[in-house]
């Protein structure tokens, strides 16, 4: 379980919000106008990692090849999120060798074991734990073989291709292990008939602050700034993590302001991107990211996950900001100009 509270994330985010407002005010970006209304909104989230209340495990293999390179075989597909890179980093860190010495084969049913799907924000936490275990086993085995081969105790594997290739040849000739299996099952308990139980072994917590500017003539909503704060356990790869958060923020912006599947008599009437609108780079505002690290006792090196949590609070934080700016309650998304106009008209009639 996370060592951080949502309050920690909210407090850190609030500090960033105040700093950004002060900077924008000094630079003349917050000029008041009767036409435009601004406000911040915030929303928080927590998401369990893995398959809810079900068995969730991963098996991987790690091998020292005769070339001196290590080869990781993992079933989880890298669909662009960079998990192949993160898994190699975990293996390299546990082995104590440079990252470039680890190669990876992923999602090849002929060669890889079942490590589960790349869903449910589970790859880093569950598959990564299996990778760490495999690397630990292989490292121990290889250090023992190195002692037998050279007659001296080694505290670490030498990061040298020639030395590792010679060690691999020795292991082959003396029938020593060149491969290790890692497996990890997320701690959880099946849900009872009331739907209660320990559904997840770990949770990712996060908050998003969004500043909007609403045009009271056209009812168009522009998001001017976003601040995100997430507790991801230990950040294995901060650059990939930042990319995941930016992608989640952009998805949530589209979800909150423009994306809507329209049906008429069971037929989709906006099947093309001329009517099903998506955010572009011009729509995504500057994003200030804050990563507060803790250490999960089960995850690899204390890591958890960030994939889906990054997209969860965004639409709600934008809706809360619009609500604060226009003094209306947002109960439906996307927040189109037509819907916002109707809400303001209804409010004025009540008043």
Language-model-detected regions and their locations in the chain:
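Extracellular/lumenal ectodomain signal focusing on beta-strand-rich modules
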Residues: 101, 211, 223-225, 260, ...
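Extended, non-catalytic structural segments that build the interaction scaffolds
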Residues: 72-79, 294-314
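C-terminal substrate/ligand-recognition segments
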Residues: 214, 259, 306-331
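Cofactor-centric catalytic regions
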Residues: 1-71, 75-94, 107-249, 261-280, ...
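Generic long, charged, amphipathic alpha-helical segments
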Residues: 100-106, 280-304
